[in-house]
Amino acid sequence: MSRSLLTNETSELDLLDQRPFDQTDFDILKSYEAVVDGLAMLIGSHCEIVLHSLQDLKCSAIRIANGEHTGRKIGSPITDLALRMLHDMTGADSSVSKCYFTRAKSGVLMKSLTIAIRNREQRVIGLLCINMNLDVPFSQIMSTFVPPETPDVGSSVNFASSVEDLVTQTLEFTIEEVNADRNVSNNAKNRQIVLNLYEKGIFDIKDAINQVADRLNISKHTVYLYIRQFKSGDFQGQDK
């Protein structure tokens, strides 16, 4: 993106809401800092992520990842193109710009997207800009989406359509998992199933205990008992 010098005579500045930010506005922007870091980790080093605060356009960049693509850092000013995207979205139903292409000062081709960050009053207080460097070799880009060459790539994920389905799918998988473990005796299977579900956080879901109790044909009080035993470190008990 080009970086026009911002002055008090810039027409765009007159269109911005000049009210000072309150603490809630700062808290909202602060919460997006983790989004910057997370997107950069997910997409890869070929993508620059910039969080702008509209409190002061002369030093609007408050969080940036992979800023080497444009030479920007925290404290850099907003760009003229970002301002244009802002004005296109101010008062509009959409808070996401169309994708657009531009060239950084270094000459690299960038594909970009700008997202407006609004407060409770729907006032735009910040911008999240995502800029992908298209001049990076394609093989380098693809390498960020390929799992490492290790035997244990990662755990499976249940993409359930509802929390009830999530509990059911996780429960059935856990039952199969415990039944296949020869180190778990028949008398201890229910207890081990509940332990595994507890470690997976499934009991944080409302009514999960009832679902588990019904499926295992035990009382919900037994499930509660097992959970208390796990929390206290006492793994003794009998299935009921």
Swiss-Prot record:
The gene is yheO. It comes from the Bacteria. Transmembrane segments: none annotated. PANTHER family: TRANSCRIPTIONAL REGULATOR DAUR. It comes from Escherichia coli (strain K12). Disulfide bonds: none annotated. GO terms for cellular component: cytosol. To H.influenzae HI_0575. InterPro entries: DauR-like, DauR-like_HTH, YheO. Pfam families: HTH_22, PAS_6. This is Uncharacterized protein YheO.
